[in-house]
Amino acid sequence: MATKPQDANTTSREAITSKADSPPRPTALIFDSGVGGLSVYQEIRQLLPNLHYIYAFDNVAFPYGEKSGEFIVERVLEIVTAVQQRHPLAIVVIACNTASTVSLPALRERFAFPVVGVVPAIKPAVRLTRNGVVGLLATRATVHASYTLDLIARFATDCKIELLGSSELVEVAETKLHGGVVPLEVLKKILHPWLSMREPPDTIVLGCTHFPLLTEELAQVLPEGTRMVDSGAAIARRTAWLISSQENVVSSQDENIAYCMALDEDTDALLPVLQSYGFPKLQKLPI
């Protein structure tokens, strides 16, 4: 049986409802270098189920953790601009800790809509710790960012902060979301600096949006009773407040859509996952 030819820039399934059936909704762009931002999107969608969501990820330049700050700023500006030219955006969430630490000032200077960033949840972790030892698990770029060091200086002076930067763990999270198995031995190797401590952190800040995707596996490797904290819920509350504070907010009747920077076998395999998150279409974003 013959099938309709598919646009080389699009992977999709048939829309269940037509555009005319959809009420206008404010459009929120969620951006990450990979699929870790879906953990933040989940938190936002739970609080704001009726927004029009766009998820964009940079699978060409992924991962950002080893890139220069200058490269990340220019790349994020380019991608957000490309999306903004196609959709009337009400808000943008940079669901990437590495990108947030360097790109927010430039984004807020260029665009009129609010831009929300993700920063390590150090302040709540300090409140939760019982032994006074808090671990920050993030990319190397986030661990060494001046913004992160400022957060520690402001909120964690009474605690011992153990920093652990790993881009390998980002790759592990991506593998899991693509349907792969997470080897616990790999996690043990990554976390060895903490696991070998006489008094390891009892509270861990998941300072990369990929890492909440691995909470079950991390719990099997970390000492029993270790608490894990991320900023997803706080970002969702901030997003809700900013949306509610806008007057004459721009809206769209389009269905949710995901954008990548290149279509390949990996993105083809990722489509069912994106559909399960509420994104029926995946397209290449021309930049």
UniProtKB/Swiss-Prot annotation:
Lyase as UniProt keyword: no
Q: Which InterPro entries match?
A: Asp/Glu/hydantoin_racemase (IPR015942), Asp/Glu_race (IPR001920), Asp/Glu_racemase_AS_1 (IPR018187), Asp/Glu_racemase_AS_2 (IPR033134), Glu_race (IPR004391)
The answer on whether this UniProt entry bears the keyword Isomerase reads yes
Top-level EC class, please? isomerase
Keyword terms, alphabetized? Cell shape, Cell wall biogenesis/degradation, Isomerase, Peptidoglycan synthesis
Enzyme Commission number, as recorded: 5.1.1.3
Q: Name one Pfam family in it.
A: Asp_Glu_race
Identify which residues the record assigns to the active site. Answer: 96 (proton donor/acceptor), 208 (proton donor/acceptor)
Name the residues that bind substrate. Answer: 32-33, 64-65, 97-98, 209-210
Give the metabolic or biological pathway: Cell wall biogenesis; peptidoglycan biosynthesis
Write out the coiled-coil annotation as residue ranges: none
- What NCBIfam families does the record point to? glut_race, PRK00865.1-1
Q: What does this protein do?
A: Provides the (R)-glutamate required for cell wall biosynthesis.
- Report what the protein is called: Glutamate racemase
Lineage at the top is: Bacteria, Pseudomonadati, Pseudomonadota, Gammaproteobacteria, Enterobacterales
Q: Gene encoding this polypeptide?
A: murI
